[in-house]
Amino acid sequence: MSDATSSKPQIFSIQDLKQAASDKMSQMYRDYYNGGAMDNITLANNEAAFDRYLLRPRVLRNVSNIDMTTTLWGTKAALPLGVSPSAMHRLAHADGEVGTSKACAARHVPMILSALSNDTLEDVSGQSSDGSTPYAIQVSPFKNRQITTNLLNRAKAAGYKAVVLTVDAPMFGRRLDDLRNGFSSGGLGGGIPDLSFDTSATWEEKIAWMKSQTDLEIWVKGVTSPLDAQIAIEQGVDGIIISNHGGRQLDTTPATIDILREIAPIAKGKTRIAIDGGFRRGSDIFKAVALGADFVFVGRIAIWGLAYDGSNGVGLALDLLINEFKLCMGLAGCSKISDISPAHLSILNARGVLESVY
């Protein structure tokens, strides 16, 4: 075996991938992608919280043919997994968002493209040559509404199925590592000239305006309160994404998987429920579905894949999660998504007794 071959990292898990990718990035960009707000308490808790939910497999079930497929934005998806919006993929690798999209399209994994992308939305969705992979465009409440209108019109023309409005970032969180490193994005290839956010935006006005601008599905990303989930339902959004921005906005907010357990009983059947934050294993996806999520999104994982090996690295990251999720379904006795239920989870209470999650 050559020295080059023997020194190549062995990637068997997302944690392996994170380490290998982090080793390849400069400290500034590594800290930008990997870090969170203030003391990183929410960032750490997002991951740790999954360990509080214990799997309860069912046995002697026919799992000879496991069907992971589901639907999102009216389109078939390979499994309840997609890529969250994250800015400036080219900071991780020259393949950028196009490289991420290429890996997603090859696996029919949905992708939400950030408004702060380096590559154009047309080039990104163009990686799905037959249009079978669903895409959504993410927008923020920009003061300059023409930016949003232009993005919505372009997205519609390019075959996008939904718009995802980020609602938890009226201003940027305080990220200490970025301040220490003097972080600079190096410019945005997407060419958006005015990134000022409208800090006066409200539910009633913003959702009504969005509906007046597009017939794409409208989802809101950044819901962490049951009260806001109820308002989202009342405003008639097509879906909510339970998200604390990967712990990058307001530190010490709860882990998203715990929030899902709180919101799912309120929102299930009234609007679609998705979640991101802290997912690192296929079993984490399974746990979210068992708690009531229709879909799971991951952000940093795609970035780690890019940093490690460009588009091929994103494919490796997705394959790890796909294979782990399929294995978890089989070992838990589930042959299709609808088989996954709260009965597949327990929590250990303070007295050391297993309890149902609902």
Curated annotation (Swiss-Prot):
It holds the Pfam family FMN_dh. A 2-oxocarboxylate binds at residues 32, 175, 248. Residues 6-350 form the FMN hydroxy acid dehydrogenase domain. It is an enzyme of class 1 (oxidoreductase). Fusaric acid is phytotoxic to plants such as cotton and banana. It has been shown to induce programmed cell death in plants. In addition to a mild toxicity to animals, fusaric acid exhibits acanthamoebicidal, antioomycete, and antimycobacterial activities. FMN binds at residues 114, 138, 166, 221, 276-280, 299-300. Pathway: Mycotoxin biosynthesis. Its EC number is 1.-.-.-. InterPro entries: Aldolase_TIM (IPR013785), Alpha-hydoxy_acid_DH_FMN (IPR012133), FMN-dep_DH (IPR000262), FMN_HAD (IPR037396), FMN_hydac_DH_AS (IPR008259). One of its GO terms (molecular function) is oxidoreductase activity. PANTHER family: 2-HYDROXYACID OXIDASE 2, S -2-HYDROXY-ACID OXIDASE-RELATED. Oxidase; part of the gene cluster that mediates the biosynthesis of fusaric acid, a mycotoxin with low to moderate toxicity to animals and humans, but with high phytotoxic properties. L-aspartate is suggested as fusaric acid amino acid precursor that is activated and further processed to O-acetyl-L-homoserine by cluster enzymes aspartate kinase FUB3 and homoserine O-acetyltransferase FUB5, as well as enzymes of the primary metabolism. This is Oxidase FUB9. It comes from Gibberella fujikuroi (strain CBS 195.34 / IMI 58289 / NRRL A-6831). The lineage of its organism: Eukaryota, Fungi, Dikarya, Ascomycota, Pezizomycotina.
